[in-house]
């Protein structure tokens, strides 16, 4: 036998060339599986070397063709590896871009909120700490006050209108009244013609409120012109005016009483007509609404021949009252009987109509059956 028949098959197996590209886990696994298959085939061929031996083709050619390393398997796996690598790179790039955009957006929003908060922060000024800045308080008192003056100067040719005058707070006055600010006293030229006794008396009479309690009486007394007008008013004239108003009111009262009160001198016929027309007389106004039975009683009295005596206005006697009560009771009984009779008669008429309708229906049905 030839020497090569006893040579192991793995000596003739060509070694694959070394590759520089990295393989994925799946590709390595496939290669490991392929190598295990090759080893199984080699072991089988060791024991059965005569199966793959063909002398016509020169030795171990069939076995060599069967176990030749084929690069087609690797070339077929390359597109899947390239596709997976490209997807992995694309997803990683997309995640990086999204994270960058998100971080930029968060930083921009944070900067915006910080700027808004910085603008909203209260800026403390000197007026918030007046006890630390006394010069600011002094400058604040000197402001431009608007005062209304009317009428204007006599020398001005422009039409009379409200003018505006600028001054200090110490000279502030409106419509003849002066207002004191704190405990500051006004100049003495405004109060040259007023005595302190008069000021005190006026302040006691006027009962000035708590707003002026801290101020001396010289600061809130009216000007000379208004003071003179108030002193010129005589309290006696005010009392006379009040008396005239009261007298006018008392004079108009009798006319109102005549229109509102009940006139006992009117005739009884007029009284009955007003009662029938629905007007309520003041004599019965306390009872509320006038009942219909009262109107019937007046009618009954007139039918009995009773009339009111205009001179004596004498009431009814006992006999007349008994007769009136008996007649009224009889009328009430007759009214109730009449009402019951009418109700029964109406019900009887309705019953008769229903019976007649039933009879007519039965007769019409009988005639139709006969036909």
Swiss-Prot record:
Belongs to the vasculin family. One of its GO terms (cellular component) is nucleus. Pfam families: Vasculin. It is found in: Nucleus. One of its GO terms (biological process) is DNA-templated transcription. Keywords: Activator, DNA-binding, Nucleus, Transcription, Transcription regulation. GO terms for molecular function: DNA binding; RNA binding. This is Vasculin. It comes from Xenopus laevis (African clawed frog). The gene is gpbp1. Signal peptide: none annotated. Functions as a GC-rich promoter-specific transactivating transcription factor. PANTHER family: VASCULIN.
